[in-house]
From Swiss-Prot:
One MF annotation (Gene Ontology) recorded for this entry: zinc ion binding
Designated name of the protein: 7-cyano-7-deazaguanine synthase
Organismal lineage: Bacteria, Pseudomonadati, Aquificota, Aquificia, Aquificales
Binding site for ATP: L11, S12, G13, G14, M15, D16, S17, A18, T19, L20, L21
Catalyzed reactions: 7-carboxy-7-deazaguanine + NH4(+) + ATP = 7-cyano-7-deazaguanine + ADP + phosphate + H2O + H(+)
Species, as recorded: Aquifex aeolicus (strain VF5)
Length: 218
């Protein structure tokens, strides 16, 4: 099977991005990882991201500071005055854990690294159950890819397209877990909890989704 040349993967330390990283190792010749410290309540995830990047033997792992998010209010992930909800996500509206324009900012930063590294794939692990978040929907990914291509020095010089690689868009979290099992992802070394506690709280939406997805696997 022919591999693509290079990719930079958005790596949070959770099960979705870890599975994407292992998939990228299979599908690409060179794999880079990028993680973000944006003042998140669950900053402990970065410890897991570092370990995963090391285990995956990536070319390089970049950790980028995004300090302005601490100035924003209203998101339970970056505003300590907002309580992290318990139970499942709401179905028809963005949850209180939404961080404004997070994936737009992260993809923009990752695209700058991709431009500089001259790799034309940027990997993001959004999936079908992420749709309450506006910046996890297929139409956002399509628009982000178009914007990246319009502004890329790499594209202008090399006459090649940039691609936002989002292979899980049509998959459930359970599907991702099963793929991860097939790929040998060390799920025990991933972290998903909005509270940022160790051990995880087991009650927040991402803890519940993780437990359901990994049932019988981990």
């Amino acid at each position: 099977m022919k591999k693509h040349d290079g990719i930079i993967v958005l790596l949070s330390g959770g099960m979705d991005s870890a599975t994407l990283l292992w998939l990228a190792k299979r599908e690409f010749k060179k794999v880079y990882a990028i993680s973000f410290d944006y003042g998140q309540r669950h900053k402990v995830e970065l410890k897991y991201a570092k370990e995963l990047a090391k285990l995956a033997e990536v070319e390089d792992h970049f950790i980028v500071q995004v300090p302005f998010y601490t100035s924003l209010k209203g998101s339970a992930l970056i505003d300590e005055s907002v309580e992290v909800p318990k139970g499942e996500y709401p179905e028809n509206e963005p949850p209180v854990t939404t961080v404004p324009m997070r994936n737009l900012i992260f993809l923009s930063i990752a695209s700058a690294f991709a431009d500089n590294l001259e790799v034309n794939y940027i990997g993001i692990g959004v999936h079908a159950l992420d749709t309450p978040y506006p910046d996890c929907r297929p139409e956002f990914i399509t628009a982000a890819e178009a914007a990246i291509n319009a502004g890329s020095t790499f594209v202008a010089k090399k006459k090649e397209r940039m691609h936002v690689y989002a292979p899980f868009l049509g998959m459930s979290k359970r599907d991702i877990a099963l793929l991860g099992k097939e790929l040998g992802v060390p799920f025990e070394k991933t972290y998903s909890c909005y509270m940022g506690t160790e051990p995880p709280c087991g009650e927040c939406p991402t803890c519940i989704q993780r437990e359901e997805a990994l049932r019988g696997i981990l």
